[in-house]
Amino acid sequence: MPIYDKSPRPQEFAAVDLGSNSFHMVIARVVDGAMQIIGRLKQRVHLADGLGADNKLSEEAMERGLSCLSLFAERLQGFSPSSVCIVGTHTLRQAQNAADFLKRAEKVIPYPIEIISGNEEARLIFMGVEHTQPEKGRKLVIDIGGGSTELVIGENFEPRLVESRRMGCVSFAQLYFPGGVINKENFQRARMAAAQKLETLTWQYRIQGWNVAMGASGTIKAAHEVLLALGEKDGFITPERLDKLKSEVLKHRSFNALSLPGLSEERKAVFVPGLAILCGVFDALAIRELRLSDGALREGVLYEMEGRFRHQDVRSRTAKSLANQYNIDREQARRVLETTMQMYEQWQAQQPKLAHPQLEALLRWAAMLHEVGLNINHSGLHRHSAYILQHSDLPGFNQEQQMMMATLVRYHRKAIKLDDMPRFTLFKKKQYLPLIQLLRLGVLLNNQRQATTTPPTLRLTTDDSHWTLCFPHDWFSQNALVLLDLEKEQQYWEAVTGWRLNIEEESSPEIAA
């Protein structure tokens, strides 16, 4: 037997979940097509504790988060950017100064941090459970985090109902248990508040129904472990066992005094509010039994990344679904996409350092979906389409990707207002502004909505934001309307400082000879 195994090293992936209470990292490798977890790291950061009444993260909370990321960065040395995904959840969604934290994080960990929506978080949690649990049939998945609670019903890797509610064990500790005081009144108020937050979805979830309910969070794991320590051998959570836990909890006067078998010291400060939320969820949905799941958000992120490597990108399904929903003209979308990518390839060859794989994918989807707002009104098409893309639930897209797609579409026609554009942390202006220029030209050259408009020999030359489009000889004699559109487009470009669009025709072959 050879001493050295010369087979290629398995692809490794890392998923990092920046939660409101703890930061988690899980590292896995793909062996024979299966995901194998090879390491986990968890740090309690209490990020949500640092979120003030003004919705700004305190300096202390930021320091705790950055210190943890520095620790994670050590373990991630040598990982390629495409193999690492870091997601921010509720607290970073809420924090008005999240961009400041992300800017400082860039210096600590060399991978982008994606802030995901509550619904996207819920979808990824569900996928993490689906990939890691043997139970078959329709599942209800519940995750009680530090700042939000996610609830999903789905089956066979397809979420059917997806919801995220702003209630978590850290936020409820501050709201309903001031000073860490435990009493019957505080617990009941928290329980009722949780049930009330689910009021609008109760019947929808009950009617959909489920075969098995799974819990995927620190709160549910802690309840499971306390029940095991109290002698409940299967650790399943039932209404009767929740009453038992509640009775045990109410024997104590404060979080600090809390002493339950199986409850870790670090969980004391958030166990009681988490338990109250869990009771409220049971009340609202009439749950009879809840089982603990090993998989959660970070596992969902891992499988999502691995799926993209196998070209099973959920975002493509999302884009197709949206195209169907708004009945877009697929032939026109295809024409715009082909023209835009024809020019993108030329731009990329001239500006390779500015090209970004994620942005290329977003440009493709923006080209495909730029007319989703056509059903509302043609005159404000760009604004309507951008609004739909920005405010729709788009599985697979993080908040910045969704905003970027909306921005590309918002400025694909009419005036260009750079000052009105949102701030991005994952992408730089010099990377995405050329994509706006490309999409504008891709749409303009297909204004006639005919297959013959864009010449196959169209040449694009770029020098920073000074662009030249060169058309075949005598092409404009057959396409006078396109020339008029291009001349109008030149005026839009001239209104932007530093932008210039030159239009040329190749010289006559006779002259060249």
Curated annotation (Swiss-Prot):
Gene3D superfamilies: 3.30.420.40, 3.30.70.2260, Exopolyphosphatase. Domain 2 (3.30.420.150), Hypothetical protein af1432 (1.10.3210.10). It is an enzyme of class 3 (hydrolase). This is Exopolyphosphatase. Transmembrane segments: none annotated. Its EC number is 3.6.1.11. Degradation of inorganic polyphosphates (polyP). Releases orthophosphate processively from the ends of the polyP chain. Its main location: membrane. GO terms for molecular function: exopolyphosphatase activity. It comes from Salmonella typhimurium (strain LT2 / SGSC1412 / ATCC 700720).
